[in-house]
Amino acid sequence: MNMPVSTPEELRACIAADAQTSPSTYLADDSFAAWCYDHLSLSEARSAFERDADPDECEQWELTALEWKAQVEMAIIALTAAARMQ
């Protein structure tokens, strides 16, 4: 079992080190990144990343705007890696 990562950089490193493992396994199950991975398409996640942090999501997930952005970026990284595996 993989330990969840907490930054986009850590996620990139894990995926680079083990391209055969599903990238979603590196996301904490209860994280906003995992929620985005499970509920958004890659294009939806990219669109979210290009706008300001959603204040309602920040409140719900107890994230700062910068943390929100990092979580969305992690979902994008994981979704991109998953698409490459197919």
Locate predicted features.
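N-terminal acidic leader/helix
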Residues: M3-S31
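Short intrinsically disordered terminal tails
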Residues: M1-E9, I77-Q86
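Acidic, low-complexity, intrinsically disordered interaction modules
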Residues: T21-L79
